[in-house]
A protein has these predicted regions:
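Phosphate-binding glycine-rich loop
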Residues: 189-228, 246
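PLP-dependent aminotransferase-like
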Residues: 221-282
């Protein structure tokens, strides 16, 4: 570009984010084929993977339409080189990404046809969406945390109650030291506290910085692209993301249906478990549905699963169903069952990130070798130990949670939403089709957000939530009485429904 055009004539900055595309050449016959598309895609992925924010190029005049369709814009400067006429072109990478949606199907098809030898992935890695839009209102630089009082964060499933007073007192008493001191390398005290509370041996416990840490660590060790996995649908989105996008293995879905209240048909599931999967994932209670399989039924089901099939049971919300409903003791004696427990949602510790696996020691041995030192921070270890030492406090909060959920369900039904029964700290709702101004879940979520009420569009949390007779689904976390009232009023006002 510098050879033909002075930089001051170009309407963009020459900085470290600017890249020039040059010499992307294919034969004339291939210019409107997949070859040209693949070459452009590879160039854009190179720029994107290296942190580029804008591209510029000189494009031949006779194929200008092809560049424009791809998302490039003409600067309005014509360049001649010999007998060939060119146009100066540019585009932001954000615009190119937005335009690439129109070619997504074609590009996905190309991935299976090419031998990709470049040092970055064929597709831009995408994370799993988990909600948390309320931080857009609070601010992610944490300089306006007082704004949290102005909003209701019901789009993620954090506890509505604070941690045990024991947790707060211990952290406050020792906070400077806790922040400046390295934690025990292997979390020995935390492991012992968990094992004692759950009635298992320390060798049955593997700690982690929340359940996501454990999912990524375990699944990438156990599975390959040739593996086969089974998940519920709908269920917690991280599982499909890790299995399909990170590992790339085959994933089958056990569909749950609204006509059944999204309950799991154990007889059908038992048949599915005989198909020789490498991994089966069961979230119990399930999210976003809230449905729950009783302990005795689940243990009977899992007792007949072939030993070559690992079964991962996510019990993040099981305390809301009753502490006696956990299958941790069963998993500790099992050859192939692993329980994953987050301490975020039921102990009000989402901010410090602590969780663990409970399983037979032989299943955790290899994962223990892959666990980095200091995997759980010192404040998190101390908070978790103190929380486990105060079961009475949390048991009382779980009782209150059921009461608050019942009140929230009644309020949501009163403004026209259909609610599904569940045992967790959240409510899954279906919007009825037609009849009111706000017709779909995405619109409802956006309008509630403008009122400082953040709820989750659940329509993308499973294939079973993307259709049906209604206008979509939302998942709403249980808040305290005041927060629940704001949620109900926000939904009512956003839908235009009568008081």
């Amino acid at each position: 570009m510098d050879k033909y055009v002075a930089r001051e004539l170009l309407p963009f900055a020459f900085d470290d984010g600017l890249y020039e595309l040059r010499l992307l050449t294919v034969t004339k016959a291939a210019r409107n084929t997949e070859v040209a598309t693949l070459l452009m895609h590879a160039a854009l992925r190179w720029v994107e993977s290296h942190g580029g924010t804008r591209i510029m190029a000189i494009g031949r005049q006779e194929i200008l339409d092809m560049y424009l369709r791809a998302g490039l814009e003409s600067v309005g400067i014509e360049i001649r080189s010999g007998a060939v006429t060119y146009q100066a072109l540019h585009a932001s990478m954000d615009l190119m990404r937005a335009r690439s949606v129109h070619f997504a199907k074609m590009i996905a098809g190309l991935e299976a046809k090419v031998s990709w030898k470049l040092s970055f992935p064929f597709q831009r890695p995408a994370g799993c969406f988990h909600g948390g839009a309320f931080f857009d209102a609070i601010g992610t630089k944490f300089d306006t945390l007082e704004r949290r009082e102005e909003i209701v964060n019901a789009d993620v499933l954090d506890a509505w109650f604070p941690p045990s007073p024991r947790v707060i007192a211990k952290l406050q008493a020792h906070l400077p030291w806790l922040l400046q001191t390295s934690p025990p390398t292997s979390c020995d005290g935390l492991i012992e506290a968990i094992a004692t509370a759950r009635g298992v041996l320390p060798c049955n416990i593997l700690p982690g910085a929340g359940s996501s840490d454990l999912i990524f660590r375990a699944f990438r060790h156990w599975l390959t692209r040739e593996s086969r996995a089974l998940i519920l649908d709908p269920t917690y989105g991280e599982y499909a993301h890790v299995l399909e996008q990170v590992i790339g293995c085959t994933v089958d879905r056990f569909s749950l249906h609204p006509v059944d209240g999204f309950a799991v048909d154990l007889e059908k599931l038992s048949c599915a478990l005989e198909r020789g999967y490498d991994l089966v994932v069961l979230v119990n209670p399930n999210s976003p549905t809230g449905c729950f399989i009783q302990r005795e039924h689940l243990q009977a089901l899992l007792s007949n699963v072939p030993e070559r099939t690992r079964v991962w049971v996510d019990e993040t919300y099981v305390e809301y169903a009753g502490a006696a409903q956990s299958i941790e003791k069963f998993a500790a004696r099992s050859e192939n069952v692993i329980v994953c427990k987050s301490m975020s949602k039921v102990y009000a510790l989402s901010g410090v990130r602590v969780g663990y696996l409970c399983a037979g020691a032989h299943q955790l041995e290899a994962l223990r070798a892959l666990t980095p030192p200091w995997v759980v921070s010192l404040p998190a270890q101390v908070a978790a130990v103190e929380a486990l030492a105060d079961p009475e406090y949390y048991a009382a909060r779980y009782v209150e949670t059921h009461q608050l959920r019942a009140e929230l369900e009644a309020g949501l039904r009163g403004v026209g939403l259909k609610t599904f029964p569940g045992v967790g700290n959240f409510v899954l709702c279906e919007l009825p089709a037609g009849g009111l101004e706000c017709a779909d879940a995405a619109t409802l979520v956006a309008r509630c957000r403008k009122r400082g009420v953040f709820i989750r569009d659940a329509s993308g949390m499973g294939r079973g939530l993307g259709g049906g007779a209604g206008a979509g689904y939302v998942r709403i976390a249980v808040r305290d009485a005041r927060g629940n009232a704001r949620v109900v009023e926000g939904v009512r006002a956003s839908r235009g429904s009568p008081r």
